[in-house]
Amino acid sequence: YGPKGIGALFIRKGVDLKTIINGGGQELNLRPGTENISGIAGFGLAISKACNNINNNMLYLKNLENTFIKKLNQNKIEHVLHIKDRLPGVLTIGFPGTDGQSLLIALDLKGIAVSFGSACSSGTTKASQILLDSGINKDLAKSTLRISFGKIHKSEDVEYVAEELSNIINRLKK
């Protein structure tokens, strides 16, 4: 909800961060280049607005998640929610016995944008190494999608996605 190309990094005390881009001495020698002042200002405003309503926003996103999962359950769609401690509104969810890439393509044809695997592995057809390293077996990792909801979504949107996803899974399993 803020400008692209800008962000913040919280570094836990005691963590030794190494630079990955060499150059000038800006940002404590961690990232070279002139700071994007307008991006920083926009990011600050976005954070301020998000924090003003953080509890309401989190509750809204959790309600959307619950609506989505409830609809999958009503449709008797087997699923595995991978990450318990996560950002509200972002589901990493596996559908055993279903190919995640096929799901992604079929959903895309319906105008529904999701991602395959984890954020670290988007753009690849291989099982996400992050999911594998967290103990998820390869077959389940290959059936995993990342689905995100935001404040622009309504309950009807989430129900539509769950219904279309259910229809696609049932069709693929025939």
Labelled PLM ranges:
Residues Y1-K174:
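Pyridoxal 5′-phosphate
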